[in-house]
Design a protein with these regions (language model features):
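Hydrophobic core register within WD40 beta-propeller blades
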Residues: 51, 128, 195-197, 262-264, ...
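Beta-rich carbohydrate-recognition and catalytic domains
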Residues: 17-44, 53-121, 130-186, 200-257, ...
Length: 367
């Protein structure tokens, strides 16, 4: 995520624009939120930006590739790159603060906080959810692979982390790692779950994607299980286009065009489920679709926002757009995304890049 296969990048230009019948108002920068997550020392930027609210006073943020060091004169100094980190956001008296956490090697050097128990590969955190007092979090297992510069990695599986004490400091978490069996990784096709989670009545809906070799577009997939039973993999069911099947091979795409990271949540102001993601492959456009059901059918896409960072340089791209429901309101959604550069040097030399960045989108109330 800090670096990506740039020879495949397709940047799509355009101005922000909404259809006249769109339920959304024009997106605006949420600088008041973005500024909370910036720091000039220690933790100095990350992507990923998945969050889980564990109480009214605390939200956990899970980051993928993370920079540590200092920021001076708009540059990152003494930079160290690790594979993941955790932010703890606490709310008090209408204000919020964020403390960042990462791991250490036996030599005392900075390292990722979440590490595979067998020591092979690394984790990028994806969607998580509270189940009673326990937090469950999907971790995409990654490994090094042959490939062009910036693309020397591959998916190696998905692990479910069960954290028994998420209210404690992250470095003291008790974490159980469970291999997710509902994964298919082949030379021509891969299927992964954990991109998004949505709880509706008695079910937890777990979203993922199918990706075919050579394809630019990922296809949205959906599984479900009983509420608070994500780790009971034998009970998972997969949407097959008209109903639910226990067989992963029966899963049918809900739509084509999602990113690996996206969000699905019910929005009271819309009285519908909302899907938000970055359009196409590394497009600067964040788009939305709506549905009356968690499985669709989904509406035509509506462009919510074109990330301004792509205008700074041809070396800059944006991705990872998703709703943060814990920061959103009935008639306002808060969306986060990441802005990156095509080289590590580009990120090091421009400290405007590679922070959790937020926008707010007002919703026109539905009668």
């Amino acid at each position: 995520m800090a670096t990506i296969c740039f020879w495949m990048i397709m940047m799509i230009s355009g101005q922000d624009g909404l259809k006249t019948n769109s339920p959304f108002a024009r997106a605006e920068p949420a600088k008041d939120i973005s500024d909370v997550f910036k720091s000039s020392k220690g933790w100095i930027g990350a992507d990923g930006n998945y969050s889980v609210k564990i109480s009214d006073e605390k939200t956990l943020w899970f980051y993928s590739d993370t920079w540590l060091g200092d920021v001076e004169n708009n540059k990152r100094k003494n930079p160290v790159l690790i594979n993941n980190s955790v932010g703890v956001q606490e709310f008090k008296d209408g204000q919020s603060t964020v403390q960042y956490h990462w791991g250490k090697t036996v030599e005392g050097k900075p390292s990722a906080l979440l590490v595979p128990k067998d020591g092979n590969g690394w984790f990028w955190p994806f969607a998580g959810i509270m189940q009673g007092e326990k937090l469950v979090l999907f971790l995409f297992l990654m490994e090094k692979a042959d490939g062009p510069s910036g693309f020397a990695f591959k998916n190696a599986g998905v692990v479910l982390a069960e954290i028994d004490n998420p209210n404690d400091a992250p470095n003291f978490w008790h974490i159980k790692q469970i291999k997710v069996p509902h994964v298919s990784i082949g030379e021509q096709r891969k299927v992964l779950f954990g991109s998004a989670i949505c709880v509706v009545k008695d079910f937890t809906y777990i979203y993922g994607y199918e990706e075919n070799k050579g394809g630019f577009y990922k296809k949205m997939l959906l599984a479900r299980c009983s509420k608070n039973q994500v780790a009971k993999f034998a009970d998972w069911e997969f949407y097959d286009g008209s109903g639910w099947s226990k067989n992963l091979e029966d899963a049918k795409p809900l739509m084509e065009g999602v990113a690996s990271e996206y969000s699905v949540n019910y929005v009271p102001g819309l009285k519908k489920f909302l899907l938000v993601y970055h359009d196409a492959f590394l497009s600067p456009d964040i788009v939305a679709r709506t549905s009356l059901n968690p499985w669709g059918p989904w509406s035509e896409k509506i462009k919510l926002h074109t990330c301004e960072e792509k205008r700074w340089s041809n070396e800059v791209f944006c991705y990872s757009g998703k709703v943060q429901p814990w920061l959103s309101k009935e008639n306002e959604i808060i969306i986060s995304y990441a802005a990156n550069a095509k080289s590590l040097a580009g990120v090091i030399n421009d400290a405007r890049l590679y922070w959790p960045t937020f926008i707010r989108v007002k919703i026109n109330p539905v009668p």
